[in-house]
Amino acid sequence: MEKTINSILPNLIMGLHPYDGVSYKNKNIDKKNLELFKNTCSVSKVYEYVIKKYNLSMAQIDHMNPRLNRQHIQALQETENKIKKKIDLLAYILIPIKYENKIISYSKRSHATLFHADMNHIGYEKYINKIYKDEILKYNLEGDYNNLITSNNTKPYTEMESENFTIDYSLLEQYIGFFHGCDILIADPGAEIDLLAITGRFDLIKEYINFLRKKFKIVITSVHHAGITIPLLEENNIDIDGYLTPTNKLGMMMFPNKETVEFAVKNTNKPVIGMKPLAGGRFLGEQAFEYVFDKLKINSCMFGMGTIEQADSTIKSALNVIK
């Protein structure tokens, strides 16, 4: 029988961070993470512990940081060999959007375009109030809101310009090739879909989803601006198997704001995987998972692992809520 996403999605998915250093707090903690998880053994022992104890079955992998991501994949493979059990893989894959022969997936103008759309959607005051309370966003801005890209300091893409967006499929093939030897269960094209949805390029979205479906049975998508993007994708009948999006009670990285994301998540019929439930380590314990599983009625959640002690505490909290 062919597997469907509903039949294979577990309640808990083991996320990549902080094994690539990312703490969502500050550079000093990032450095400590890099030192703490500097080799495959330091990572695989955590996986071995939690899989044996809690029977977790799915892990996220990535390609954006080749050296550390390759080490992470090796740690998963070593774990599989030790425990004699297959770990299902959910692979993040960046979608390389091009404009004027340059990759713009995370360009300043792309950020400005998203800022402009978010602001127009909920209003300037609400949006600014959300942004300046978002500690993960501040971390992404290297701790300084002066680095924030807005539609005031950077020109958003116009509708006419967006008509010239393309997808670089040769580069996309390279990204997929990074996972050679991995048996990927779920492909997760990145939140570049936000830019394409907001600029109305649903033709490109359908095009690359069809491309990925030829290679992977299950294709979901990351979404960072779920309050706008999810309704747009559904209005335009985008054939996607589910969404992976930030969901935490503090509303961090939930754009345009927490309320719009909650509405979108509650009103889709597609499976949703919540991520960043702990708000980058700022909202811990059972309360984090009560928000995801009880309030939002989401059935699957991706969380950051960390050390054995950290992972143990997080999983216990989640299971207390799930039970």
Which ranges hold each PLM region?
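N-terminal small/glycine-rich loop or linker at the start of catalytic domains
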Residues: 5-34, 101-105, 130, 135-161
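Structural recognition of the beta-strand scaffold that forms the well-ordered cores
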Residues: 13, 60, 90-91, 242-244, ...
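Active-site mouth loops of central-metabolism enzymes
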Residues: 24-42, 93-96, 119, 148-171, ...
